């Protein structure tokens, strides 16, 4: 059946493989007789291995496990390899009468007394004299003896069958006839050649039937074959697939059309049958699928591994007893985790597994035991996956809510959740929890970080954490740096000599083996007093192969020597080259290789194939593969040296023992060999030689190059639209890197958008970043660094919408387009790939045409989110590089900012944390909370050292100030809360003194003047008090003399001058000291905060939207700059740079502004906070953390960060008034620090081109693109018009009434009408062509709204109709020509924008209630209400129509852009742009919009005429709801019914000609 097998291999197997891959399944064909000579194919060992492989297939395959090709040959009957003693005696008794036959049998078999019971073992034929022709064959002799013994009842029928069954019948019996699955996993393809019996003697049929040695037909074999076919037909008719062929002399000739047709039908039927079986099993699995099936599979895997590890357990009883006692002692107290350590192979794993089995008996049957043998499965390979699976299992075990999706999206949050979960479990005070994590040194990340950030340094009561690791490794050192208590560490020592011998005996007994006394002597002599279980197991692996007649050789005395000895034995048996390459590939792989992958890789290795086919030629002229039998033989001899681990949906083989891996590295992967192994693996996982691509090779017996198909698995990125090739994604970058193929790595992986999106979507952003982190240090490529940072910046958008292609492509394209031209090799190619994907995308999509999102290379270091409420306090531990965060829910979280990981979750406070101070060289922190406790923490151990009940008012509504002052020299802390000052001794936790003030006049601030030994306090009523800081004795009390009738709002101490600077409710700043006070400055508004520099040379005062800087002098402080620093919203906080050359300020509008003090307050940068008011800015070195009370996230900024690659400088508009001209070449906005001027920003150059003086504050801006005019509406009510081609000329439009500020303006689509809106007045003017600039005439019409509310948005049409929206949500259409108003249905809140379509048939209005309304202006009625709500932020900021009026684009309050259909109101696309946009301008194919980040969005909107699935791009959009309501109502009645709201027309059309006098020309 060779032609059939080759046909299936060439055509059927690849098709089934692709089918399985599309369903997320691996497909492996096991045909051990392919590629080897017939003498090996019929070898007794081959038969045994075939049956073993069949059993393995039945255990692992969910679909077909067995396929038989049955023709007209029954095949040879193999001789049993082993015959048990009782059966041997029965056979021998039947042969006593035939001495020659008996002598033949005894010559081939030798007794082995080392088996239990003893057996007779067939000896290899090469060691025997070949029997003469007169002797009966061994097979026939044994058959005769078995026949007689069975007849006499001495052996069973099953034993009799062992001598009469051929290989094919053995396999069909095991694979089909005796299988519990029946025909569900098995198929027999039967080839029936008609009229064959008529041609049985023809030469051409010699190979088609069984024949005897003399060439005669073997009738016995043919009879057995007929019986086998009958059994199959009777027992499993559904599994039998018959193919009837007519006889012909060239039946097996490939050129025979009938035969070719048969082969085609066979292949098609094989594919159909196999695919059907796979689908049937998939349906059953789907019905039985559990929601958390992945978790249950993980748990089962580790339990099975545990059972295997403890099958033979010996020794360590004393250590187990000590561990049990320690667990009992720790049960009711806070304690450190336990760490078991010892050299590799000492028995740590079996000890951990044994302890896991004994824990329930020790701590109670309700104890929850969670065991992980790390590194043995995909979910235990890295800390991120490990914590995820542990959290799920613990939550399930205790009936707690499962981790939410937001937690699982970031490793830092999973770590925080895990820490919190342990405390939650402890507080239940019921069931104990024991976590056992074996081999933490096998975690991917733990070796590379000096701090094990995910590890809880203290376990709460009833929670136990036990780890094991190897001694002498970097991991143990890292653990010792994290867990510093010596009692944490328990050494696992070697067994005693007697225990070592007992261990060997137990291993032999488990295998039903024993040793002869002489062999035992040799074994013990080789292992004098050896108690190392790993070494003992290696010795056992050698000794268990000894038969009683084997003369043993001395074994190696050390584990390393024994490992080398094992390799030598394997090389002698299987060939040095094959062993070196097989083991080299397994060790070189990232996590291991599946058997199918290994066989494919060996089929690509020319050196291996040339060695294999040295003595015979391959069976096929079309394809070349590695003979799988050679691998199975080697795998069998490797035995326990290999371990199977489930990874990426496959069962991978890896080296079980670290010692063996190290020896393989030294022995087989030194020098260039390592790069060669990685190179072949890279070729395989890249798919370079798959899908019919042939590879040249020269085989020894051929002598000429052969170009043959290696038939290896294809390696696409996606097997189907939902199934990614995880194995390729995991392995390829690793092998390209270590093969030194860095350019290929850059082009095909790190610089390939298809790769990036596939890796990100299938594994998540953090897995994608891990790949970049692995490769970047070896590449020295700024481009790679930029792409990595760009991916990291995608985080917020991914959390909002989920990681799907459109999000990732948009995010990266909009960030990397800045660098596409300057770096075309990698970034340019990435951008082109993204653009090509967008062009082919069948869904409505917003496509970036230029960079507009924050580019990589900027100051943002990280955005971190914890599992807690808003952040209320932050402190740095610079020495330990830690950040301590206090939160509203009382949690204290310690972050390693560099690793971006949670180090500790400090649980103790039950209410909001108000204040945190770090001291003792960054090792201790003390916190104050609304729960009126002080808690002292060790930042190294995470342990709470002291709890102090600090007292204070229990009235939650009473306004109080909290503060802490640590005096390290005296080891005391001063806590202030309301009207109480307490001094506590940190060593004894004793109260030293308590100062109680007037409850009705609490202290606003208290300063510790350490140098003077004073406490200085300022009360709400302005009373100054001084006490001795040592004894708390009152020394002075007086009322402020310089400030009257003002309340203190904030204060800061000036330690170098022993003074206090206080801010007051009416803007006063006073300098307060012992015995005196004086007014320092009077600010226009209440002082919100005060900040002083580290050297006391600068003072910062925040008031309203402004910040003022003061410089220290001999008298106190004087103003540093003439102008104040200005925000657009209330300034909340500020911090000074490390050298006083920068100041960073934060405001309620979530913006952070960076100013240069060395350049007199020049604004350097505007940064986006966390989307909530910036309430905290804290600096540590050059890093600044920004946080908010309303967000659980915080951002880390690097002040010294310089741009890695130059990108355009953003324009610094903070007003949201930016206007755009010249098709996006120039941007106009009020000048920073001087709103009486308008900055003209050149986007191409990234610099200010000019500045226009308006003499008054600018309130709004509009650009007439065609007319080239800039309209500036001022707070004075004047509108200045600047011709853009001659900016020295200015037109002035005066206001209708004095001191009325311009609220908004609008131009008609044809730019021939201008509407200017004030609070309740609208002017409509005409714009007509003129020379040198257009003429502005009018106002042609003026009307009043007659409403108390103000106009906030306006739009004008060419026919003098005006649509305007009010502050209360009202919306009106006013026809100036006929002086009529048409009320449109009101919004529920302030109207934020009104826009008219280009045809002026439609209008769209947006409001702060997130509602967009589409209006038919001809019928004056609503068409659609389109609502879009985000759970965090609601509202519409701006909108516009596309040029063809088919779509509406809207800028939303949640920093996203939406696209809607005007035909049916459908939401077509949503794009998160990270920034607020206040204006959208339509372009020919999309829109452009200036952002609050200072970039101009340019996007193309592509909307296929037939939308494939209009909601598909929105399927993952989280936390948002959109709704469309169709409006069906009659046209509105005439406006008489609402005359009270009708505007009053002041000027009519006829007055148009005499209005020019109101416009003056300024030269």
From Swiss-Prot:
Keywords: ATP-binding, Cytoplasm, Nucleotide-binding, Repeat, WD repeat. The keyword Repeat applies. One of its GO terms (cellular component) is nucleolus. The keyword Cell cycle does not apply. Pfam families: HTH_NWD1, NACHT, WD40. ATP binds at residues 342-349. PROSITE patterns: WD_REPEATS_1 (PS00678), WD_REPEATS_2 (PS50082), WD_REPEATS_REGION (PS50294). GO terms for biological process: negative regulation of NF-kappaB transcription factor activity; positive regulation of gene expression. It comes from the Eukaryota. It is found in: Cytoplasm, Cytosol. InterPro entries: NACHT_NTPase (IPR007111), NWD1 (IPR043365), P-loop_NTPase (IPR027417), WD40/YVTN_repeat-like_dom_sf (IPR015943), WD40_repeat_CS (IPR019775), WD40_repeat_dom_sf (IPR036322), WD40_rpt (IPR001680). WD repeats lie at residues 274-314, 866-905, 908-947, 954-994, 998-1037, 1044-1082, 1126-1165, 1168-1207, 1212-1251, 1253-1292, 1346-1385, 1386-1425, 1431-1470. One of its GO terms (molecular function) is ATP binding. Residues 336-666 form the NACHT domain. Signal peptide: none annotated. Residues 1534-1563 are annotated as: Disordered. May interact with HSP90AA1, HSP90AB1 and BAG2. May play a role in the control of androgen receptor (AR) protein steady-state levels. PANTHER family: NACHT DOMAIN- AND WD REPEAT-CONTAINING PROTEIN 1. This is NACHT domain- and WD repeat-containing protein 1. It comes from Mus musculus. The gene is Nwd1.
């Amino acid at each position: 059946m060779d032609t059939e097998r080759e046909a299936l291999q060439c055509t059927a197997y690849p098709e089934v493989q692709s089918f399985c891959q599309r369903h997320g399944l691996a497909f492996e064909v096991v045909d051990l007789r392919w590629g080897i000579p017939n003498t090996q194919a019929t070898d007794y060992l081959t038969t045994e291995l075939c049956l073993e492989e069949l059993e393995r297939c039945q255990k692992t395959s969910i679909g077909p496990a067995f396929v038989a090709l049955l023709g007209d040959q029954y095949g040879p009957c193999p001789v049993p390899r082993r015959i048990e003693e009782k059966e041997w005696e029965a056979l021998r008794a039947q042969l006593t009468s035939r001495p020659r036959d008996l002598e033949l049998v005894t010559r081939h078999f030798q007794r082995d007394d080392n088996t239990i019971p003893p057996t007779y073992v067939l000896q290899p034929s090469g060691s025997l004299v070949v029997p003469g022709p007169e002797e009966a064959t061994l097979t026939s002799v044994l058959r005769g003896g078995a026949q007689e013994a069975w007849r006499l009842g001495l052996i069973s029928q099953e034993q009799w069958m062992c001598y009469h069954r051929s290989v094919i019948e053995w396999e069909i019996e095991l694979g089909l006839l005796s299988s519990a699955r029946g025909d569900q996993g098995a198929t027999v393809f039967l080839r029936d050649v008609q009229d064959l019996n008529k041609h049985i003697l023809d030469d051409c049929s010699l190979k088609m039937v069984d024949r005897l040695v003399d060439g005669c037909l073997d009738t016995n074999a043919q009879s057995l074959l007929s019986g086998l076919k009958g059994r199959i037909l009777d027992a499993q008719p559904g599994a039998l697939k018959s193919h009837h062929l007519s006889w012909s002399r060239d039946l097996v000739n490939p050129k025979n059309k009938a035969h070719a047709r048969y082969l085609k039908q066979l292949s098609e039927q094989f594919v159909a049958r196999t695919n059907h079986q796979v689908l049937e099993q998939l349906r059953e699995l789907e019905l039985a699928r559990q929601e958390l099936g992945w978790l249950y599979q993980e748990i089962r895997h580790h339990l099975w591994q545990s059972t295997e590890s403890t099958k033979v357990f010996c020794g360590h009883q004393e250590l187990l007893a000590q561990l049990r006692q320690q667990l009992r002692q720790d049960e009711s107290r806070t304690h450190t985790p336990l760490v078991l350590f010892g050299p590799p192979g000492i028995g740590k794993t079996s000890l951990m597994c044994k302890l896991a089995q004994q824990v329930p008996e020790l701590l109670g049957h309700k104890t929850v035991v969670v065991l992980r043998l790390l590194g043995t499965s995909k979910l235990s390979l890295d800390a991120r996956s490990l914590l995820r699976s542990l959290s799920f299992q613990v939550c399930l075990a205790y009936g707690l809510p499962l981790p939410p999706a937001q937690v699982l999206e970031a490793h830092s949050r999973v770590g925080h959740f895990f820490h919190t979960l342990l405390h939650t479990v402890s507080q239940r005070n019921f069931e104990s929890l024991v976590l056992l994590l074996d081999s933490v040194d096998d975690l991917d990340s733990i070796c590379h970080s000096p701090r094990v950030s995910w590890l809880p340094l203290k376990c709460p009561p009833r929670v136990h954490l036990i780890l094991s690791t190897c001694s002498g490794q970097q991991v143990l050192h890292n653990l010792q740096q994290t867990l510093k208590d010596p009692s944490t560490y328990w050494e696992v020592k070697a067994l005693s000599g007697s225990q070592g011998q007992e261990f060997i005996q137990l291993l032999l007994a488990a295998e039903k083996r024993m040793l002869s006394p002489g062999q035992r002597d040799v074994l013990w002599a080789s292992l004098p007093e050896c108690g190392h279980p790993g070494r003992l197991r290696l010795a056992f692996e050698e000794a268990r192969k000894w038969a009683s007649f084997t003369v043993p050789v001395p074994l190696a005395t050390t584990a390393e020597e024994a490992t080398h000895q094992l390799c030598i034995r394997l090389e002698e048996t299987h060939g040095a080259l094959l062993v070196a390459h097989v083991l080299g590939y397994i060790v070189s792989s990232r996590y291991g290789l599946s058997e199918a992958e290994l066989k494919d890789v060996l089929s690509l290795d020319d050196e291996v194939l040339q060695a294999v086919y040295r003595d015979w030629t391959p069976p096929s002229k079309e394809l070349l593969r590695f003979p799988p039998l050679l691998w199975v033989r080697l795998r069998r001899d490797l035995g326990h040296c290999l371990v199977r681990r489930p990874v990426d949906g496959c069962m991978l083989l890896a080296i079980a023992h670290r010692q063996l891996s190290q020896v393989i590295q030294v022995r087989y992967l030194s020098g260039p060999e390592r790069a060669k192994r990685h190179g072949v693996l890279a070729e395989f996982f890249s798919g370079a030689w798959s899908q019919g691509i042939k590879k040249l090779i020269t085989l020894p017996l051929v002598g000429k190059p052969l170009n043959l198909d290696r038939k290896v698995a294809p390696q696409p990125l996606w097997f189907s639209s939902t199934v990614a090739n995880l194995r390729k994604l995991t392995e390829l970058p690793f092998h390209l890197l270590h093969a030194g193929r860095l350019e290929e790595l850059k082009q095909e992986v790190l610089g390939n958008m298809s790769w990036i999106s596939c890796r990100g979507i299938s594994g998540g952003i953090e897995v994608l970043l891990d790949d970049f982190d692995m490769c970047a240090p070896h590449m020295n490529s700024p481009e790679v660094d930029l792409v990595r940072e760009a991916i990291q910046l995608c985080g917020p958008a991914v959390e909002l919408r989920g990681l799907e292609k459109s999000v990732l492509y948009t995010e990266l394209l909009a960030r990397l387009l800045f660098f596409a031209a300057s770096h075309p090799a990698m970034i340019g190619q990435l951008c082109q790939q993204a653009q090509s994907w967008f062009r082919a995308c069948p869904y409505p999509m917003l496509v970036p045409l230029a960079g507009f999102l924050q580019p990589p290379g900027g100051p943002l270091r990280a955005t971190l989110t914890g599992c807690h409420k808003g952040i209320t306090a932050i402190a740095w531990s610079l020495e330990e590089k830690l950040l301590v965060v206090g939160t509203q829910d009382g949690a204290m979280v310690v972050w390693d900012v560099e690793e971006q990981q949670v180090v500790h979750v400090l649980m103790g406070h039950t209410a909001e944390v108000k204040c945190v101070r770090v001291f003792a060289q960054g090792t201790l922190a003390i916190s104050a909370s609304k729960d009126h406790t002080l808690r002292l923490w060790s930042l190294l151990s995470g342990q709470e050292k002291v709890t102090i009940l600090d007292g204070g008012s229990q009235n939650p509504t009473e306004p109080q100030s909290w503060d802490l002052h640590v005096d390290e020299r005296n080891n005391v802390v001063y806590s202030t809360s309301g009207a109480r000052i307490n001094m506590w001794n940190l060593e004894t936790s004793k109260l030293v003194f308590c100062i109680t003030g007037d409850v009705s006049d609490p202290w606003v601030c208290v300063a510790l003047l350490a140098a003077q030994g004073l406490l200085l306090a300022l009360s709400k009523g302005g009373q100054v008090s001084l006490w001795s800081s040592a004894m708390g004795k009152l020394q002075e009390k007086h009322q402020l003399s310089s400030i009257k009738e003002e309340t203190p709002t904030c204060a800061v101490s000036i330690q170098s001058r022993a003074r206090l600077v206080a801010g007051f409710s009416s803007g006063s700043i006073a300098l307060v000291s012992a015995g005196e006070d004086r007014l320092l400055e009077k600010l226009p508004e209440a002082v919100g905060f005060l900040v002083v520099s580290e050297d006391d040379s600068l003072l910062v005062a925040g008031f309203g939207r402004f910040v003022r800087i003061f410089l220290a002098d001999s008298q106190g402080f004087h103003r540093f700059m003439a102008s104040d620093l200005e925000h657009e919203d209330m300034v909340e906080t500020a911090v000074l740079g490390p050298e006083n050359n920068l100041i960073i300020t934060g405001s309620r509008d979530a913006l952070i502004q960076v100013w240069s003090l060395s350049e007199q307050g020049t604004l350097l940068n505007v940064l986006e906070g966390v989307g909530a008011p910036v309430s905290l800015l804290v600096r540590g070195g050059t890093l600044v953390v920004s946080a908010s009370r309303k967000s659980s996230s915080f951002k880390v900024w690097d002040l010294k960060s310089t741009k890695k690659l130059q990108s355009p400088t953003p324009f610094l508009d903070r007003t949201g008034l930016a206007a755009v001209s010249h098709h996006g070449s120039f941007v106009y906005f009020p000048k920073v620090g001087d709103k009486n001027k308008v900055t003209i920003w050149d986007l191409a150059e990234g610099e200010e081109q000019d500045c226009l003086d308006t003499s008054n504050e600018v309130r709004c801006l509009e650009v007439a693109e065609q007319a080239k005019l800039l309209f500036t509406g001022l707070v004075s009510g004047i509108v200045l018009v600047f011709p853009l081609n001659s900016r020295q000329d200015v037109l002035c439009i005066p206001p209708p009434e004095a001191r009325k500020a311009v609220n908004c303006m609008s131009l008609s689509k044809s730019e021939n009408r201008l509407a200017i809106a004030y609070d309740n007045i609208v002017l409509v003017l005409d714009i007509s062509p003129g020379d040198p600039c257009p003429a502005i005439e009018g106002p042609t019409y003026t009307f009043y709204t007659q409403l108390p509310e103000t106009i906030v948005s306006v739009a004008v049409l060419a026919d003098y109709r005006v649509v305007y929206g009010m502050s209360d949500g009202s919306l009106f259409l006013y026809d100036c020509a006929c002086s009529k108003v048409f009320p449109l249905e009101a919004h529920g809140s302030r109207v934020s924008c009104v826009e008219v379509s280009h045809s002026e048939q439609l209008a769209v209005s947006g409001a702060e209630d997130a509602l967009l309304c589409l209006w038919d202006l001809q019928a004056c009625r609503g068409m659609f209400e389109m609502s879009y709500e985000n759970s965090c932020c609601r509202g519409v900021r701006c909108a516009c129509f596309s040029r063809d009026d088919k779509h509406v684009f809207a800028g939303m309050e949640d920093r996203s852009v939406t696209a809607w259909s005007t035909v049916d109101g459908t939401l077509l696309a949503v794009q998160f742009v990270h920034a607020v946009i206040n204006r959208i301008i339509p372009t020919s194919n999309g829109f452009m919009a200036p952002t609050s980040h200072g970039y101009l969005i340019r996007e193309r909107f592509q909307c296929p005429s037939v939308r494939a699935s209009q909601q598909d791009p929105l399927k993952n959009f989280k936390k948002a709801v959109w709704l469309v309501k169709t409006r069906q109502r009659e046209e509105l009645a005439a406006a008489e019914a609402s005359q009270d709201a009708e505007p009053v027309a002041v000027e009519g059309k006829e007055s148009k000609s005499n209005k020019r006098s109101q416009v003056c020309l300024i030269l």
